[in-house]
């Protein structure tokens, strides 16, 4: 009987390990600026909300920042990063609704407007994976909107 329970526990832990993976997110292009880097791994129901399935806040070094989310259950997720330059804890927008803070999402460089979950989602399976994103900083200006630049 004890052997049965021990075997059940072992098989149960193997099954849960097989359905979860570590997700490493490489954030490229982080600039040397003040403010915390807020990152979040989110399900569809958590998308663009304050907290996700897993969240990490850190003071970033410039260059590439790596964030590891351990034992992520298989499924569809979005990742977003906010370099909170003004320290207010949320995305700051200019009068023309352009982000004043740095930000990154999977596929973010292709976005033409506000993202949807389907625009930026990726799939986590049972294998560990690395996702790469690039920080975007607008500084309140869009170069193509100002021909003098």
Stretches found by the model and what they are:
Residues 32-49:
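Short, ordered, surface-exposed loop/turn motifs in non-cytosolic proteins
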Residues 14-20:
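Sec/Tat signal peptide C-region and signal peptidase I cleavage site
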Residues 4-14:
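Sec-dependent N-terminal signal peptides
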Residues 77-81:
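A short tyrosine-centered beta-strand micro-motif
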């Amino acid at each position: 009987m004890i052997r049965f329970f021990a075997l059940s526990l072992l098989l149960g832990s193997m099954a849960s390990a097989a359905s979860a993976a570590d997700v490493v997110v490489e954030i490229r292009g982080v600039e040397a600026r003040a403010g915390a880097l807020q990152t979040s791994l989110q399900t569809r129901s958590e998308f663009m909300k304050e907290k996700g399935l897993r969240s990490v806040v850190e003071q970033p070094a410039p260059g590439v920042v790596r964030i590891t989310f351990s034992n992520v259950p298989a499924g569809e997720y979005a990742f977003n990063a906010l370099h909170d330059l003004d320290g207010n804890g949320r995305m700051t927008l200019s009068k023309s609704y352009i982000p004043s803070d740095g930000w990154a999402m999977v596929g973010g460089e292709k976005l033409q407007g506000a993202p949807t979950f389907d625009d930026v989602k990726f799939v986590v399976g049972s294998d560990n994976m690395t996702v790469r994103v690039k920080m975007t900083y607008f500084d309140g200006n869009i170069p193509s909107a100002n021909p003098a630049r």
